[in-house]
Structure formats: C-alpha cells, structure tokens
A protein has these predicted regions:
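Proline-rich intrinsically disordered, low-complexity coils
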Residues: 17, 39, 98, 102, ...
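N-terminal accessory beta-strand-rich subdomains and adjacent acidic, glycine-rich linkers
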Residues: 1-124
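Residues at structural and domain junctions
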Residues: 82, 128, 143-146
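Long, charged amphipathic helices and adjacent flexible linkers at domain junctions
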Residues: 121-135
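Aromatic-lined carbohydrate-binding/catalytic grooves of carbohydrate-active enzymes
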Residues: 133-181
Length: 181
C-alpha cells in the first residue's frame, strides 16, 4: 500500500499486491515530495481494514526526491530499500558538507490502517514536533481562497476580515492567485 494523488485528492490509498517482483515508488521531480507520491509504504496480507489486521509500515523522513523499492523473493521474503533517489541526485561530500542518510521509520500494528495512522500521529507529536511548540496554541488563519476562490474584491475582503475577527482569526491571508485577479 502506498499513498498518492493530486491536488484536492491527496493521500489516496493505493493497494498493490507484492508478488515475486519489485515495486518502485519514487519522486524525481526536482522538488519536494508531494501529493503525487509520499515516501511511505505499508504492507499487509491483503485483508487489513481501517480497524483490523496486521500492518507493517515505513516512512522515509525526507522531503526531497526519494525512491522506495519493495521486493519479494521466491521464498516469500519481503525487502524494503528506501532512501534518496539516485536518478538525479549528486552530492559532493566534503568535511564541511557531510551527508547523513535520512531515517526510515518502521512500525507495526494489529489495528489496521487506522491504528497505523494513530501510531504515526502520536510518534510525530511526541518525537518530531519541537516540544517547546507542542502545546503552544497556534494562530487561527483565515484564507480568502476557500470562501471566494477567484471572486476577490474589496467588498468580499472587508466581509472576510469581519468574519475572521468574529471567529478569532489573527492573520487573514489573500493568496497569490487572488492578488493576480
């Protein structure tokens, strides 16, 4: 299982059976990984649901071009190779600019894909999020794109600012697309 998609349809679950073959998931768009592919893979027997079933999973802690190869051999053993995509990556190593391979986080749950999501959320909150920011209230941001899309004008902006003030939003954002209109 891997997650892919497009704008507005991010993180669509794609289940692909792992036979005696290789499955290659990669991003080499010269940009960060995005909705098209995420550096993540999950393995189950094919019967896991959102609430039940064993799921083994791994996430590459890397936001750039990546490659994950899932391979099953004749004996049924599964191997995962994950890291920076070798397609177009060139890294000159020096004493001043060493390279540290990104971490690949592995996990297991017997509680299906939902259990996997909950475990990953807790792990990110407990270990990745800087603890000095973990419990700090975040500002409420009001973005003009969602209520008005391309229909941005002075009247709508004033109405939006008034609504934002009523709900306690601190910043009001007018997106670059809106500015061009």
């Amino acid at each position: 299982t891997h997650y892919a998609g497009a704008w507005g349809a991010e993180y669509t679950r794609n289940r692909v059976p792992v036979q005696q073959n290789q499955i290659v998931l990669e991003n080499h768009r010269l940009t960060c990984c995005a909705a098209q592919h995420t550096p993540f893979v999950a393995l189950d027997s094919g019967s896991a649901t959102e609430e039940t079933g064993e799921v083994f999973y791994g996430a590459l802690c890397w936001s750039g071009d990546f490659k994950i190869i899932v391979e099953r051999n004749f004996g049924g053993e599964v191997r995962i190779n994950a890291g920076v995509n070798d397609y177009d990556t060139r890294w000159v190593l020096t004493a001043e600019h060493p390279f540290e391979s990104p971490e690949f986080v592995l996990g297991y749950t017997a509680d299906g894909f939902g259990g996997m999501s909950k475990t990953l959320f807790d792990w990110q909150f407990d270990y990745l999020l800087p603890q000095n920011k973990a419990l700090t209230p975040r500002p409420v941001i009001y973005n003009s794109w969602y209520p008005y899309e391309f229909d941005v004008n002075e009247e709508n902006c004033i109405a939006m600012a008034q609504k934002a003030a009523r709900i306690g939003a601190e910043p009001v954002v007018t997106t670059a697309t809106d500015v061009n209109q």
